[in-house]
């Protein structure tokens, strides 16, 4: 044995320990569907994006059936600015008119979707890019939002334009893709019963897909470590009841509330558990699925 081989032995032992730890997790998820929502913010880091694609290919090669749903808010914003189209947000959602929805579809179902497919292909995977309109996979209805004025306590409706929420998922399209051993990469653009195109929030879209597929896990990759308590410390696990209590007492606020609502919906539709985790952490998906420690906040129907 050469000196260089001898020096490498400690690292080999560490890698062996990692593989031993990962094996039972791989067996647990064999042939199981895992839906992963990949946010637009994470795509800005090319190295992190390539790591993500590598992880997805490894999941597929390990026997899992990954389904990717991606966002693209920052990229949409930049394109709207470039085209001189003003954009407005209400209640955390982009108000979408006819001009905006054309840009949303172009960016999400076009450039971003194919970019992710390309990254996965470069790592040796076989991915196919689709949006909710393809095969009438996701039918949406116009989203409605009601807010309460804190001063008068009067409810008012917020018009979001062509923002949709999933009404029906045709899982036969996804079943066919998965049976062909392809990795679906889905853009959250859907169609209404009248043929109208709708911009759907990526978290909401991912929750509907996961629920329809009865996925083993739904992973929501975000730009925060997970759900935080009032001291800004990570909460490792929550039940649905815990989530509702933390919303009521003001611990969970702002943009985390719709994410939690998506988690609750998905679990009630049959998803075993949902994890909110930081997509900027290298190999966060593998850490969550294939290690004893996990990553982020695990949400399930009831406490362990």
Curated annotation (Swiss-Prot):
Q: In the Enzyme Commission scheme, what number(s) does this protein have?
A: 2.7.2.8
What SUPFAM superfamilies does the annotation carry?
Carbamate kinase-like
- PANTHER family of this UniProt entry? N-ACETYLGLUTAMATE SYNTHASE, N-ACETYLGLUTAMATE SYNTHASE, MITOCHONDRIAL
Protein name as it appears in the record: Acetylglutamate kinase
Q: In which pathway does it act?
A: Amino-acid biosynthesis; L-arginine biosynthesis; N(2)-acetyl-L-ornithine from L-glutamate: step 2/4
Which EC class heads this enzyme's classification?
A: transferase
Q: Where does substrate bind?
A: 72-73, 94, 199
The family database entries (HAMAP family) matched by this protein are listed as: ArgB
Any one of the GO BP annotations: arginine biosynthetic process via ornithine
């Amino acid at each position: 044995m050469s000196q260089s081989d001898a020096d490498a032995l400690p690292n080999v032992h560490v890698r062996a320990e990692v593989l031993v730890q990962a094996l039972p997790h791989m067996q647990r998820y064999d042939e199981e569907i895992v839906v992963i929502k990949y946010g637009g913010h994470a795509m800005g880091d090319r190295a992190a994006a390539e790591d993500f694609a590598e992880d997805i290919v490894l999941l597929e090669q390990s026997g899992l059936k990954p389904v990717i749903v991606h966002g693209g808010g920052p990229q949409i914003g930049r394109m709207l600015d470039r085209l001189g189209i003003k954009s407005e947000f209400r209640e955390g959602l982009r108000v979408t008119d006819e001009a905006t929805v054309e840009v949303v579809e172009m960016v999400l179902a076009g450039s971003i979707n194919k970019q992710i497919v390309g990254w996965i292909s470069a790592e040796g995977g076989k991915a196919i890019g689709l949006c909710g309109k393809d095969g009438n996979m996701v039918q949406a209805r116009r989203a409605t939002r009601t807010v309460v004025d804190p001063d008068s306590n009067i409810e008012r409706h917020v018009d979001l334009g062509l923002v949709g929420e999933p009404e029906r998922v045709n899982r036969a399209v996804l079943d066919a893709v998965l049976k062909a051993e392809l990795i679906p990469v889905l853009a959250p653009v859907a169609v209404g019963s009248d043929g109208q195109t709708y911009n759907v929030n990526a978290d909401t879209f991912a929750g509907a897909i996961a629920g329809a597929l009865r996925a083993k896990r739904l992973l929501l990759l975000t730009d925060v470590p997970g759900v935080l308590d009032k001291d800004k410390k990570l909460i490792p696990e929550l039940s649905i009841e815990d989530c509702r209590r933390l919303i009521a007492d003001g611990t969970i606020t702002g943009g985390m509330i719709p994410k939690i609502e998506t988690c609750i919906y998905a679990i009630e539709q049959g998803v075993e558990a949902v994890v909110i985790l930081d997509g900027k952490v290298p190999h966060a998906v593998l850490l969550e699925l294939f290690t004893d420690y996990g990553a982020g906040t695990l949400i399930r129907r009831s406490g362990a």
